Amino acid sequence: AESASSSESSSSESTSEGKKFEARYRVDKNGGGTLSVGNDTGNSSVTYTVTDPDKSITVTAVPAEGHVFVKWSDGLTSKTRTDTDFKQNLDVTAVFGTASVPNPSEGKGAVGSSYTFKAALSGKYAKTENLRWYANGQEVTQAAGKSSITVVVDSSMVNASYKIHAVVTYNDCKVSSNTLTITIGSGVTS
């Protein structure tokens, strides 16, 4: 039988052995959020020295109030990223955008009257098609994607109060409006 050489395995060791790489994560200069790594939250930048190329680093971009996470500067669009298999330095920036959903503050109504709710979205990442409406915590599915909804008050709604709010979502980030509370009266005035 031929004897296979047993020395070949030693030459295939990792070529990046002994090299150091730097992994740097930053928040875009316009701000709008922070970075968190495990329980370490609220960072504007985090830097790691990577001596083991198989090391894995997980960083999450956390949008501030009224902001959504847009993307990482290298094109990744999920707010949590895990980098491993380092062959070179990494330097990425988390980009955030503003999004807000203003809402009217209060309303009262009676049977037969109707309400119109409008969400005046602001910020280029607040898109109408990503808008969802909720009444008392339940999504109003037929209102999805509409910036204006009209509700006609019927007798089943008398003496009830409804909390209405709108949420716009972008890349898994949710921005909510204020909650509008409506109280429906019977319409009978004494």
Question: What positions do the PLM features span?
Answer:
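Ser/Thr/Gly/Pro-rich low-complexity, disordered linker/stalk segments of secreted
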Residues: 1-19, 188-190
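Short strand-edge motifs at loop-to-beta-strand transitions and within beta-strands
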Residues: 44-48, 57, 79-84, 90-92, ...
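Conserved "repeat-terminator" motif of extracellular CCP/Sushi domains
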Residues: 1-3, 17-27, 81-98, 164-166
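Surface-exposed interfaces of beta-sheet-rich extracellular modules
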Residues: 55-80, 124-132, 173-174
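Surface-exposed, flexible coil segments in extracellular/virion-facing regions
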Residues: 74-85, 134-153
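Proline-enriched interdomain boundary motifs that mark the N-terminal boundary
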Residues: 97-106, 189-190
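Short, solvent-exposed loop/linker segments at the N-terminal edge
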Residues: 48-53, 107-113
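Extracellular modular ligand-binding repeats in secreted and cell-surface proteins
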Residues: 38-67, 85-88, 158
